[in-house]
Regions:
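Bacterial N-terminal signal peptides
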Residues: 7-19
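N-terminal capping segment at the start of a domain
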Residues: 26-65, 205-210, 283, 354-359, ...
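Noncatalytic luminal/extracellular "stalk/propeptide" segments of secretory-pathway proteins
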Residues: 29, 33-36, 52, 56-155, ...
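Soluble metallo-hydrolase cores and metallopeptidase-like ectodomains found primarily
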Residues: 31-33, 108-148, 211-291, 303-316
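Extracellular/luminal Protease-associated
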Residues: 65, 115-221, 289, 390
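Metal-dependent peptidase/peptidase-like ectodomains
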Residues: 111-113, 132, 220-223, 230-231, ...
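Acidic/histidine-rich catalytic neighborhood of metal-dependent amide-processing enzymes
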Residues: 180, 201, 258-261, 284-375
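His/Asp/Glu-rich mid-to-C-terminal helical/loop segments that flank catalytic regions of hydrolases
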Residues: 306, 310, 422-469
Length: 469
C-alpha cells in the first residue's frame, strides 16, 4: 500500500516514530497512510467548496419542503461525482408543516414591536391574532409547577438565559423550555407561549427549533423572542405594570410525507460487510441557509470519504456516509434507519457524526469497551498534532449517532469548539460567512484519521452497553 501511496502523494512518507508494537490493532503502515491523509487534508482539503455549493445551490432545507427535495438530489450527485462505489437513498416518513407569518407587539403599557420566530410545528393564532397579558417564568420548571389558575388565558413567557461554553453545555438546560414549554402552557390553559431564544448572541434574530408537539390536545401558538426583545420584555415587566402583547401567527400542519436518508459507500476490500458509519444531517431550519447546522458537517464527512476513495486501494472495511433526513424535528431519519437495519447493527463497527458547526476540533471522546482503548490511544498520536486532546469515554457520537449507541454500537466523538456556535444556531444568521475554511480543513484532517484507521484496524471494537442495560 505504501508504494502506490508514495506515487499518489508525490512525496516521501515519513515513517512515524510512534513506538507502536506489532501486536497493536493498527499497523505502522496504516498509521503512516493515515498521517499522509491527515496532512493532505490540512493542505488541500476542499470541504469548503462542498458547503458553499450546498448553501448556494440548495439553501434552506427544512424537512418536507422543496429545499429538502433539492438537497437529496444534490447529495446524490456530489457522492457520485466523488467516486463513491455505491450511492442510494432510503425513504423515511416525516411530519410536514408550513411556516407562515409571525408578528408580535407590545400593546401596553409601552407599545413596541417584538422580533419573533414561530417554533417548529407550532400552532396559529385565531384569525386577526390574539392579545393577552404576559406572565413571566424564570424557566420551564417554574411554569410546570405553577397553578393553572395563574396561567390560564395569559401568554407564558419563559425567560431562561443560555450560558456560553466551548462545549455547548448550556444548550440542554435552556432548550428544555423550547421542548416542554408549549405543552406545559397549553395544559394550563395559556393563550400562547413566548420563549427567550435558545442562543448566546445579542443579535436581534430569534432562534427557531423543534418542540414536543405530539399528543398535545389543544396546542397554542409558541414563539421564540430574540435576546434583545426578551430583555425589553423583562424590563417592561420590572416596572410593575401589566404588559399586554398581541400575537398574529399563521402556520399549517400538513399530512405526513416522504423524505430520504442519502447514503454513499466506499466498499471494503476484505470485510465489506463490516461498516463504519460517519454521518451528518442534510436537513436544516428554513430561516438561514444551514451553513453551520449542518452544512459544515455534511462537507466534513463527504470530504473525508472522498479523500479515502482517492487511495490506491479501498479500506479493509466499508466506509458508509449517511446524510440523515429530518434530524431537526426529532432524529427521525436516524430512528427510522436503525429500525430498518436492526438486524445489521452487529456489523456496524462504529458510528460518528459531525453536527456542531465548523469550529476547530479540540477533544476526542469515545464510547468503547475498556479493552479497546488502545485503538483510541493510537489515534490520539495522530490527532494530538492537530491541537486535539483526549476526552472521556462517554461519547454518544452526535445526535443521530446516539440512536445507534443506544443499541450498543461503539462511537467516536470529535468535538468542535462551540463557543460561538449558538450565536447563529437556528437563526437567519446561519450563513456561509460563518464557516472558516482553515477550521474546516482541520476538521477533515481529524475525521480522515479516525475514519481510515477504524476501517483498517485489526479485530473489532466489540459492543457497548445499550440504553436498557
Amino acid at each position: 500500500m505504501l508504494k502506490p501511496l508514495l506515487s499518489l502523494t508525490g512525496g516521501l512518507i515519513t515513517t512515524m516514530a510512534l513506538g507502536i508494537a506489532q501486536a497493536a490493532p493498527l499497523s505502522q503502515e496504516d498509521v503512516s497512510v493515515a498521517e499522509v491523509l491527515r496532512d493532505r487534508a490540512l493542505e488541500s482539503s476542499d470541504a469548503y467548496s462542498i458547503v458553499e455549493s450546498l448553501t448556494v445551490e440548495v439553501g434552506p432545507r427544512r424537512t418536507g419542503t422543496e429545499g429538502d427535495e433539492r438537497a437529496v438530489a444534490w447529495a446524490q450527485d456530489k457522492m457520485k461525482a466523488f467516486g463513491f462505489d455505491r450511492v442510494y437513498t432510503e425513504q423515511i416518513e416525516v411530519p410536514r408543516w408550513i411556516r407562515g407569518h409571525a408578528h408580535a407587539e407590545v400593546i401596553s403599557p409601552f407599545p413596541q414591536p417584538l422580533v419573533v420566530s414561530s417554533l417548529g410545528y407550532g400552532a396559529a393564532t385565531p384569525a386577526g391574532g390574539l392579545t393577552a397579558e404576559i406572565i413571566e417564568f424564570p424557566d420551564v420548571q417554574a411554569l410546570l409547577k405553577a397553578p393553572a389558575s395563574q396561567v390560564k388565558g395569559k401568554i407564558a413567557f419563559i425567560n431562561k438565559r443560555m450560558e456560553r461554553a466551548r462545549t455547548g453545555e448550556g444548550y440542554g438546560p435552556a432548550a428544555q423550555g423550547r421542548k416542554l414549554g408549549m405543552r406545559a402552557a397549553a395544559e394550563k390553559g395559556a393563550a400562547a407561549m413566548l420563549l427567550r431564544s435558545v442562543g448566546t448572541d445579542s443579535d436581534r434574530f430569534a432562534h427557531t427549533g423543534m418542540m414536543s408537539v405530539d399528543d398535545v390536545e389543544n396546542p397554542v401558538p409558541a414563539l421564540a423572542l430574540s435576546a434583545p426583545d426578551a430583555n425589553l420584555l423583562e424590563a417592561m415587566l420590572q416596572r410593575g405594570k401589566p404588559v399586554q402583547v398581541k400575537l398574529d401567527v399563521e402556520t399549517e400542519r400538513l399530512s405526513d410525507g416522504p423524505s430520504f436518508n442519502v447514503i454513499g459507500e466506499i466498499t471494503g476490500r476484505e470485510q465489506p460487510e463490516e461498516v463504519m458509519i460517519i454521518g451528518a444531517h442534510l436537513d436544516s431550519w428554513d430561516e438561514g441557509t444551514g451553513a453551520l447546522d449542518d452544512g459544515a458537517g455534511v462537507a466534513i464527512v463527504m470530504e473525508t470519504a472522498r479523500l479515502i476513495a482517492e487511495l490506491p486501494q479501498r479500506p479493509r472495511r466499508t466506509l458508509r456516509v449517511v446524510l440523515f433526513g429530518a434530524e431537526e424535528i426529532g432524529l427521525v431519519g436516524a430512528k427510522q434507519y436503525v429500525e430498518a437495519h436492526v438486524k445489521e447493527l452487529d456489523n456496524i463497527i462504529a458510528v460518528s457524526e459531525s453536527d456542531f458547526g465548523a469550529g476547530k476540533v479540540w477533544r476526542f471522546d469515545t464510547r468503547l469497551p475498556e479493552s479497546k482503548f488502545d485503538i483510541a490511544d493510537q489515534m490520539m498520536q495522530l490527532l494530538a498534532p492537530l491541537g486535539i486532546e483526549r476526552g472521556n469515554n462517554e461519547s454518544y457520537g452526535g445526535p443521530d449517532s446516539s440512536v445507534f449507541v443506544a443499541r450498543g454500537v461503539p462511537a467516536f466523538g470529535l468535538y468542535q469548539d462551540g463557543t460561538d456556535y449558538f450565536d447563529y444556531h437556528h437563526t437567519p444568521n446561519d450563513t456561509l460567512d460563518k464557516v472558516d475554511p482553515e477550521n474546516l480543513r482541520q476538521n477533515v484532517a481529524a475525521w480522515v484519521v479516525m475514519s481510515f484507521l477504524t476501517t483498517e484496524m485489526e479485530g473489532d471494537l466489540g459492543r457497548v452497553p445499550t440504553a436498557s442495560e
